[in-house]
């Protein structure tokens, strides 16, 4: 059995296109574009000059537009100038009105001040009359009420004096105690400065502390001995129990 032949013939595309011949194109070719009719230099100059001059209709239109624009500018300027003048006049009028109103307000304020001062004087007169009436009523009170008031006042004064005296005495006592404490703290406790009674008290305290220490040591020794004796008994009991079987 032989292998199948899968070879394909190679075809050159350029050669195939040449064999077909020229394509019939519908339209101008490149050669037609290159061979087009061209104007001479003189004709070009004439066209440029015409462009520079421009058309007469366009020139007339531009002139009319410029004239209209100038007229509008003049109108606008006139309006602005008239508006500025009117605004300046309005400002002057407002200033005059303010001055007039200020004068009227000053006169009204002066009148109001005078009225307020008169009302204040009336209020003061009323207050003075009320005070006089109160004083008269106090003077006309019964002498008994005045005596009771004076007695209560004297009692209150005596109580306050006693309290102040007690407070001052307490403060003095506290100050004296604090001074004594500071003196004792500052002075060193030497054998020469201490008195005989102080020495006796110190010795007694030392003896008591020594006796207490001895007692505590004796108790500790007894406890230790008791512990040792109990341990020995336990050991003997354990050894006897082990020997018996």
Swiss-Prot record:
Record keywords: Phosphoprotein
Organism from which the protein derives: Mus musculus (Mouse)
Annotated region (Disordered), positions in chain: 19-38, 69-245
Name of the protein in question: Protein FAM133B
Low complexity bias: start-end ranges: 103-119
Superkingdom of origin: Eukaryota
Disulfide bond residue pairs: none
Composition bias, Basic residues: 89-102, 128-140, 220-237
Xref: InterPro entries: Fam133 (IPR026766)
Comp. bias (Basic and acidic residues): 69-80, 165-176, 209-219
Modified residues (Phosphoserine): 82, 190-191, 193, 195
Keyword Phosphoprotein: yes
Family per similarity comment: Belongs to the FAM133 family.
């Amino acid at each position: 059995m032989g292998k199948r032949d899968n070879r394909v013939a190679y075809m050159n595309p350029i050669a195939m296109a040449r064999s077909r011949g020229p394509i019939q194109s519908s339209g101008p070719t490149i050669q037609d574009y290159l061979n087009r009719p061209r104007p001479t230099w003189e004709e070009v100059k004439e066209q440029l000059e015409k462009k520079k001059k421009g058309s007469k209709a366009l020139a007339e239109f531009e002139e009319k537009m410029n004239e209209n624009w100038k007229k509008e500018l003049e109108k606008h300027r006139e309006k602005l100038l008239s508006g500025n003048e009117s605004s300046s006049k309005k400002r002057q009028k407002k200033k005059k009105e303010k001055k007039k109103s200020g004068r009227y307000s000053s006169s009204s304020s002066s009148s109001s001040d005078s009225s307020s001062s008169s009302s204040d004087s009336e209020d003061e007169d009323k207050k003075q009359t009320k005070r006089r009436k109160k004083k008269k009523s106090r003077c006309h009170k019964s002498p008994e009420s005045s005596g009771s008031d004076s007695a209560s006042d004297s009692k209150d004064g005596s109580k306050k004096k006693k309290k102040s005296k007690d407070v001052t005495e307490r403060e003095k006592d506290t100050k004296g105690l604090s001074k004594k404490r500071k003196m004792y703290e500052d002075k060193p406790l030497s054998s020469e400065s201490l008195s005989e009674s102080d020495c006796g008290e110190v010795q007694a305290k030392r003896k008591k502390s020594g006796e207490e220490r001895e007692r505590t040591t004796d108790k500790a020794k007894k406890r230790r001995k008791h512990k040792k004796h109990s341990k020995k008994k336990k050991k003997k009991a354990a050894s006897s129990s082990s020997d018996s079987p």
